[in-house]
Amino acid sequence: MSVLTTRAPAKINLTLHILGRRPGDGYHALESLVAFADVADTLELVPGPDLTLDISGPTAGPAGPLDDNLVLRAARHLAAGVDGLRLGAFRLHKQLPVAAGIGGGSSDAAAALRLLAELNGLALDYPAVIAAARATGADVPVCLDPRARMMRGAGEEIGPVLGLASLPAVLVNPGVPVSTAPVFKALGLAVGQQLDGAEHPVVGASLDADAVLGVIAPARNDLEAPALTVAPVIGEALGLLWAQAGCRLARMSGSGATVFAIFSDDGAAEMAAGAIRAAQPGWWVEPTRLA
């Protein structure tokens, strides 16, 4: 069989409400409207007898040890759940920043499961595929079918696909990796403690651009404030986005440090990206669309 290829797009939390810490397992309960960007890593699978991984690309270095990569972790979980699973050699081209709040590793893992499912004739809702996604990480299930939807629970509860309009946007990462654990520590919730805040807005099944802004503008990312204490440069990145002509909303994604802004049109997004690159040439800046 020829090489199988898929994209692993950046996952953007348009909203991220933390409801509290669950008393049973201590995980943080959340509600989040998730969309996906045009920018992505690329993953290939060459069918073969063994599971292997090769990583290249501009952000390959920070991706960490090969043997601990989420691509192989997801593949091993699936192999453990499916007798006789056909395997192969993965080739990952890393374009997305690592530890950046955009689910790069989770999206890569989900891409690996998609390719193995394709190779083995498995549906994405096949129980072993879902189980492997959940075992690999909280963000992996929503990345299996990378289209806009709501996440709830600790990330394991995935809502139906939503018809969100494609939004002109800019993603900015100031080059500072931010691990999730210190951000949750800064949030400071004890097990069983609830976080006060307005309820998440109701999200309709189909929304044009103005309706999407109407939903997300009054919402929030509850991890933004604690992340600013961990990496204050996030605030600088947000300020640069808000200062650009045509910016309709700027917010942090996930636990940071990537921030995003929704713009009035693609031209405004392109101009904003150019201005921010000129001001901060060492930052990762990408005009894109979110849907």
Swiss-Prot record:
Gene3D superfamilies, per database record: 3.30.230.10, GHMP kinase, C-terminal domain
Top class in the EC scheme: transferase
Catalytic function, reaction form: 4-CDP-2-C-methyl-D-erythritol + ATP = 4-CDP-2-C-methyl-D-erythritol 2-phosphate + ADP + H(+)
Molecular-function GO terms, alphabetical: 4-(cytidine 5'-diphospho)-2-C-methyl-D-erythritol kinase activity; ATP binding
Record field: transmembrane: none
Pfam families: GHMP_kinases_C, GHMP_kinases_N
Annotated keywords: ATP-binding, Isoprene biosynthesis, Kinase, Nucleotide-binding, Transferase
GO biological process: isopentenyl diphosphate biosynthetic process, methylerythritol 4-phosphate pathway; terpenoid biosynthetic process
Listed SUPFAM superfamilies: GHMP Kinase, C-terminal domain, Ribosomal protein S5 domain 2-like
UniProt signal peptide: none
Pathway(s) the chain acts in: Isoprenoid biosynthesis; isopentenyl diphosphate biosynthesis via DXP pathway; isopentenyl diphosphate from 1-deoxy-D-xylulose 5-phosphate: step 3/6
Active site, UniProt feature: 11, 139
Domain of life the protein comes from: Bacteria
EC number from the UniProt entry: 2.7.1.148
Any coiled-coil regions, as ranges: none
Binding site for ATP: 97-107
Family designation: Belongs to the GHMP kinase family. IspE subfamily.
Function: Catalyzes the phosphorylation of the position 2 hydroxy group of 4-diphosphocytidyl-2C-methyl-D-erythritol.
Name of this protein: 4-diphosphocytidyl-2-C-methyl-D-erythritol kinase
Protein species of origin: Methylorubrum extorquens (strain PA1)
